[in-house]
């Protein structure tokens, strides 16, 4: 169950010494039983890769993601048949599992599809560059203001029925701009730039606001991290100037796979989160969707925004290390990884040990060959033979009443 975050009290209000991440204040947007923004914890999302027409497969994929911590699940809806399949998926989910907050991904000329799927999901994602698709011209090199405005009117008329439907149902919309699919008129007017991405989002926001609909989440994704960072920062600047407080969905699109895909996503998402920007995240990997969820939670844990696992502090090892640090860290982690909320330090020697682990709940430190010292906070509790270290650490945690069985 979601709970509102309580800001940590500042011990030093001087900005250069303030280690607290001060999140941008945003309006709360309900997506099923989950709230994005409004001071709630950063929400984790992903997307199934099953064909939505495969009812059983889609239900299984949604359930797999939700069971490992994916709080909102997105599905692709490229046709009317896919939209209608969402009714069956929802019914089947309720029968075999539970209701899960669902988002429908709607793209090319998607009004009829979006109106149908809005009955069956909690949020509809639209791409401003594709929602009213204009086939690129090979001869055009610019748009006059009149032409620009004429297409804007067409977009408004096409978007209005969906906005009214979502508004009247109390549901949400994500205005999801992608750098790679900006509309031609935006490209000619603003260039292939973060400014074009922001103006594309603002055009759709204004249409929604004109109909008194503000259950909006905004994203401005790009496959290049510097472009993504610039777009979100500019979006925040423009929203602040315009008095807007919409929550932001962060992600680096098409990040790839493996180690680099994870690093690339983290470089973009974590940078913005550290600046207080962002209310929900997705790490997009060219892997099974289940692989994305641990990366999301690791990013949030590393920044101190959500604590969903044990925090381990361990030195990188050097010539002073008095035991096999990598092996011992593995043993400690395997024995204690279920103790969510604890900070445990494993340090190879006395030089850095006590100081670096001062904020940890428990410490495991090499002090002399064949022996290790166990700490509770800054206090050394006992010195024990190395081969008894992990078990003695467990006993210390148990004695403090902080142990739970795996």
From Swiss-Prot:
One Pfam family, please name it.
Answer: GcpE
Cited InterPro entries: Dihydropteroate_synth-like_sf, IspG_bac, IspG_bac-typ, NO2/SO3_Rdtase_4Fe4S_sf
Q: Family membership, please give it.
A: Belongs to the IspG family.
How many cofactors are bound and how? Binds 1 [4Fe-4S] cluster.
Residues binding [4Fe-4S] cluster = 315, 318, 349, 356
Q: Give the protein's function.
A: Converts 2C-methyl-D-erythritol 2,4-cyclodiphosphate (ME-2,4cPP) into 1-hydroxy-2-methyl-2-(E)-butenyl 4-diphosphate.
Share an example GO biological-process annotation for this protein.
terpenoid biosynthetic process
- State whether keyword Oxidoreductase applies: yes
Q: What is this protein called?
A: 4-hydroxy-3-methylbut-2-en-1-yl diphosphate synthase (ferredoxin)
| Molecular function as annotated in GO | 4 iron, 4 sulfur cluster binding; 4-hydroxy-3-methylbut-2-en-1-yl diphosphate synthase activity (ferredoxin); iron ion binding
Q: Which UniProt keywords apply?
A: 4Fe-4S, Iron, Iron-sulfur, Isoprene biosynthesis, Metal-binding, Oxidoreductase
Q: In which pathway does it act?
A: Isoprenoid biosynthesis; isopentenyl diphosphate biosynthesis via DXP pathway; isopentenyl diphosphate from 1-deoxy-D-xylulose 5-phosphate: step 5/6
Q: Which cofactor does it need?
A: [4Fe-4S] cluster
**Gene designation:** ispG
| Keyword field contains Cytoplasm | no
Q: What is its EC number?
A: 1.17.7.1
């Amino acid at each position: 169950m979601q709970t509102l975050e309580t800001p940590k009290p500042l011990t030093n209000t001087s900005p250069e010494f303030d280690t607290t991440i001060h999140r941008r204040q945003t309006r709360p947007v309900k997506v099923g039983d989950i709230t994005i923004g409004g001071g709630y914890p950063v929400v984790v999302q992903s997307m199934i890769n099953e064909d939505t027409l495969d009812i059983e497969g889609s239900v299984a994929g949604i359930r797999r993601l939700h069971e490992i911590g994916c709080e909102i699940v997105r599905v692709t809806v490229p046709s009317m048949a896919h939209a209608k399949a969402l009714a069956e998926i929802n019914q089947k989910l309720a029968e075999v599992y539970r209701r899960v907050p669902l988002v429908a991904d709607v793209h090319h000329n998607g009004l009829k599809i979006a109106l149908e799927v809005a009955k069956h999901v909690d949020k509809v994602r639209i791409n401003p560059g594709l929602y009213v698709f204009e086939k690129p011209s090979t001869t055009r090199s610019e748009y006059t203001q009149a032409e620009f405005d004429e297409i804007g009117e067409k977009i408004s008329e096409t978007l209005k029925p969906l906005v009214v439907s979502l508004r009247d149902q109390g549901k949400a919309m994500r205005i999801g701009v992608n750098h790679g699919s900006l509309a031609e008129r935006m490209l000619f007017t603003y260039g292939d730039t973060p400014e074009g991405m922001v103006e594309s989002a603002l055009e759709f926001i204004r249409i929604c606001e004109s109909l008194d609909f503000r259950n909006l989440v905004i994203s401005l994704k790009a496959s290049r991290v510097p472009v993504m960072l610039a777009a979100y920062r500019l979006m925040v600047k423009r929203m602040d100037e315009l008095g807007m407080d919409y929550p932001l969905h962060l992600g680096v699109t098409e990040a790839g796979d493996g180690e680099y895909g994870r690093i690339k996503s983290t470089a973009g998402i974590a940078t913005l989160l550290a600046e207080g920007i962002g209310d929900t995240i997705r790490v997009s990997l060219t892997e099974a969707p289940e692989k994305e969820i641990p990366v999301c939670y690791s990013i949030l844990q590393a920044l101190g925004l959500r604590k969903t696992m044990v925090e381990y502090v361990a030195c990188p090892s050097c010539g002073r290390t008095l035991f096999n640090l990598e092996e011992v860290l593995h043993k400690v982690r395997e024995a204690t990884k279920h103790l969510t909320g604890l900070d445990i330090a494993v340090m190879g020697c006395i030089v850095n040990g006590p100081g670096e682990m001062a904020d940890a709940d428990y410490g495991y430190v090499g002090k002399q060959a064949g022996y290790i010292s166990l700490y509770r906070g800054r206090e050394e509790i006992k010195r024990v033979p190395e081969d008894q270290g992990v078990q003695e650490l467990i006993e210390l945690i148990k004695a403090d009443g902080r142990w739970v069985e795996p």
